[in-house]
Amino acid sequence: MIFGNIFLIKWYFKNAKVYVSKEEYDGWINKMPADKNALQVKIMKIIEKQIVQFDFNDTLPLGIKPLKAFGHTPGHTVYRKDDLLIIGDLIHGQDIQFKHPEICATYDHDENASIDTRKIILKYAEDNKLFVAGMHMKYSNSSMYRGFYVKK
């Protein structure tokens, strides 16, 4: 989810909307045991008026298309806009996981789903010749990722 930047959103981007898949929201807030979701519940309460839940068949503002990428979290999402694919937390160690998507970070909630999702999304990116950017990738210039990191 969006835990690290929550106060920036609340204090500096008061008019911002936070788009969260219904599966992600439901997984954290309604299905997760109380002893595991206390922080998420508090954060969602802080920004509840800014949250917009979406379905995966929706197109988000600016023509952004959400794609299912479950495993890291209950409703993890990657986002496509033209030839850019933002993969969020799908990859935590690019030097290892691009070559070995079967290796999981301890943060992945469902390891089997994470592995399957990484394989599917990386193949999708390669087949569609997409630029790939992620939250834990070591370069900030997404153009660095076309082909070179996505191809095996």
Regions found by a protein language model. Give the residues of each.
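Di-metal (Zn2+ and/or Mg2+/Mn2+) metal-binding site signature of metallo-dependent hydrolases
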Residues: M1-Y12, G75-Y79
